[in-house]
Amino acid sequence: MTEDIRVRYAPSPTGHLHIGNARTAIFNWLFARHYNGTFVIRIEDTDSARNIADGEKSQLENLAWLGLDWDESPDKPGVYGPYRQSERNEQGIYQEFIDALLASGQAYKSYKTSGQLASEREAQQAAKQAPHYVYEYEGLTNEEREAKYAEFEAQGLKPVVRFRVPEEQVYAWDDIVKGHIEIGAKEVGGDWVIQKADGMPTYNFAVVVDDHLMKISHVLRGDDHVSNTPKQIMIYEALGWDVPKFGHMALIINGETGKKLSKRDENLLQFVEQYKELGYQPQAMVNFIGLLGWSPKGEDEIFSLSEFKEMFDEKRLSKANAKFDQKKLEWVNNQWMRRDTDAVMPQLIQELVNAHLISADDAADKKKWLSEVIKVAGVDGISYTRQIVELVRKPFFELGDITDEMVEYLTSEDGRKVAAAWESTYESLPTDATPADYMSTIRAIQNDLEIKGRNLWNPIRIMTTHEVQGPNLPEMLTLLDKNTVLKTMRDVKEKYLA
């Protein structure tokens, strides 16, 4: 592309970073960086009643955690600021263009009460008409309309400002993702509000003013914004401005239910911060989210953010709904943890501290031992770092209960023979025995007693760890304190084999 690329991610600070919003931010970032453009963050905080205290901070922190950077934002202002809509409104930026539309007759003040609007909707439903706003100044001159304004103001009524929708107009654009789209003016529901009674601009008006003044060239956003686009094009045309290129990305749906992701669906984690707290890796989150509605060439599925940037092609954005597959996310995260376990190790150790398996001071002193424990336990079987806690809890920090099934293994004829042989040979081994030494000892017991398989391994594991499954036993034994293991064996022997 030869034109100057300027794209934006414009969240509302009404909540934390949702997976869908993260995808919007990631694709806009990729588009900007691939074409050496500018990535802008603008905060759309006009809905003060719904804004939460740390909404903006959370959004920016989680974007940074994902590895995204930006060129302009509230915390990195450029020449097109302010970058919060509330601040832009205070400066009168929107009012200037509201006044221009009022002066040209393309907008007007409406004083209808909520009761009047409800009555109109009921009448339209009774007449089986599509819901639409009924223009109240039909046939009046400008002077007569102004007189009506004064009359309503005298009654203490506060107006909203509505845009006068051209009735027969068709709004068309060539969507970057969906191709050619046409929507008739009649489909937008009649004259719509561009300024609320409290003086705040509505979303579809403010976003146009901001995108124009910030010189946004491309607008990449979710499919649910398609219905907003004709309203926005109306404002561009009414003010004589060039319309940016729009691209509407496919909806993200729940892979199990097939329904659009809903923030009210508590059965599926949908916020980046939730995955961060569980120990998902930022590279994995970007990797997974980047494949929701975009497909690379070839069969590979594991990509870094920089690799995405190099191969990004907006033409490969999909029209089909993107399935949020929790199992796929777990697999992707596991791939990233296995790719560089040493890099994830501090986080894995911290999980053990957080779970109170070990104190922070002891963790610092035993860092090498903990690293070996985690490597023996293996990250292959976990989807995120918090799961390491249960993987290593037994037998490295706690002993589980011996079940009836385990007792049967121990007290069988073969079990008693194996337990006795294992206790005596283990005690004779040096404290610095290697995995090979332990394996050789177990093989010798197998050959001497002619017992193998579960009848061999289960009694040994039960005597040593109170478990019948777990990490590689010879490797694990090198990490367990010998005196502790001997005490465990003697306790088992006294309780079940005496």
Curated annotation (Swiss-Prot):
Binding site for ATP: 263
EC identifiers of the protein: 6.1.1.17
Gene3D superfamilies: 1.10.10.350, HUPs
Domain of life where this protein originates: Bacteria
Entry keyword set: Aminoacyl-tRNA synthetase, ATP-binding, Cytoplasm, Ligase, Nucleotide-binding, Protein biosynthesis
PROSITE patterns per the UniProt record, alphabetical: AA_TRNA_LIGASE_I (PS00178)
Annotated protein name in UniProt: Glutamate--tRNA ligase
